[in-house]
């Protein structure tokens, strides 16, 4: 048994898009994977079935990560099945796009609750386990919108900027116990979140002149989650954006 085949990854929002690609990528390394989903059990079960068909081990667990009680149950179910959590990928997220002056409070709050508070709840719960294990890797999915802003996404941009600050702070708090915390910031990725956008004006701001693929984001996550070379990386944000944001 290799080290990875004994490890367990929890991926939130893993029934589609980047989350699905990440669950499949981590399972391909031999890790056991918990496929979290909020609504579509059919899609989540399909991800689990694909992992099992490829020789891996996975379960699907429903939970709204913005709800503290449901997060607690998600962690309990994971531990009942696999006894440990070595990797947490905080991927679950939503958009409620509209200009600031048209944005309703519920549109603001729904995005903040899931995209930021959900990261807090899952990270806090899993950190307790990782501190006892004296090891663990947490990867938070943020966005280039959290760095550069995006009209019509004040709620989303604020939440994703918050994730970056949260990542840096928690990385400092957990580092002494061997737990790394990093963020991955996708740009425009070919998922259902972008399929209805007019690509032409967007591509003008992407030096590589194309949308990214979920698997390209998942590759960066897989590196941070599993590669020994990532053990000395913490508190960083990795852009996977075709060159949109350069510092």
From Swiss-Prot:
Binding sites annotated in the UniProt record for substrate: 143
A biological process from GO: fatty acid elongation
Primary enzyme class: oxidoreductase
Pathway: Lipid metabolism; fatty acid biosynthesis
Enzyme Commission designation: 1.1.1.100
Phenotype for residue 160 to A: Almost no activity on acetoacetyl-CoA
UniProt entry keywords in alphabetical sequence: Fatty acid biosynthesis, Fatty acid metabolism, Lipid biosynthesis, Lipid metabolism, NADP, Oxidoreductase
Annotated phenotype, changing residue 151 to F: 2.7-fold increase in activity on acetoacetyl-CoA
Effect seen on changing residue 151 to V: 5.7-fold increase in activity on acetoacetyl-CoA
Function, in words: Catalyzes the NADPH-dependent reduction of beta-ketoacyl-ACP substrates to beta-hydroxyacyl-ACP products, the first reductive step in the elongation cycle of fatty acid biosynthesis. Is capable of reducing acetoacetyl-CoA, but less well than its paralog PhaB.
PANTHER family: 3-OXOACYL-(ACYL-CARRIER-PROTEIN) REDUCTASE (PTHR42879), 3-OXOACYL-[ACYL-CARRIER-PROTEIN] REDUCTASE FABG (PTHR42879:SF2)
Full protein name: 3-oxoacyl-[acyl-carrier-protein] reductase
Organism: Synechocystis sp. (strain ATCC 27184 / PCC 6803 / Kazusa)
Gene: fabG
């Amino acid at each position: 048994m290799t080290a990875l085949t004994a490890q367990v990854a929890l991926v939130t929002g893993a029934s589609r898009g980047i989350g699905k690609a990440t669950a499949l990528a981590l399972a391909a390394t031999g890790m056991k994977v918990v496929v979290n989903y909020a609504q579509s059990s059919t899609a989540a079960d399909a991800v689990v079935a694909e992992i099992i068909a490829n020789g891996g081990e996975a379960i699907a667990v429903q939970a709204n990560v913005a709800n503290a009680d449901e997060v607690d149950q998600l962690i309990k179910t994971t531990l009942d099945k696999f006894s440990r959590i070595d990797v947490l990928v905080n991927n679950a997220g939503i958009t409620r796009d509209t200009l600031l002056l048209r944005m309703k409070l519920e549109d603001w709050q729904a995005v903040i609750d899931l995209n930021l508070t959900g990261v807090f709840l899952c990270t806090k719960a899993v950190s307790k386990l990782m501190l006892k294990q004296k090891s663990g890797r947490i990867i938070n999915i943020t966005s280039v919108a959290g760095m550069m802003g995006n009209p019509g996404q004040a709620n989303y941009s604020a939440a994703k900027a918050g994730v970056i600050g949260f990542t840096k702070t928690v990385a400092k708090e957990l580092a002494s116990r061997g737990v790394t915390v990093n963020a991955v910031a996708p740009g425009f990725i070919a998922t259902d979140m972008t399929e209805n956008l007019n690509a032409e004006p967007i591509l003008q701001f992407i030096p590589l002149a194309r949308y990214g693929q979920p698997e390209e984001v998942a590759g960066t996550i897989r590196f941070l989650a599993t590669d020994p070379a990532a053990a000395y990386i913490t508190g960083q944000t990795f852009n996977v954006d075709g060159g949109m944001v350069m510092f």
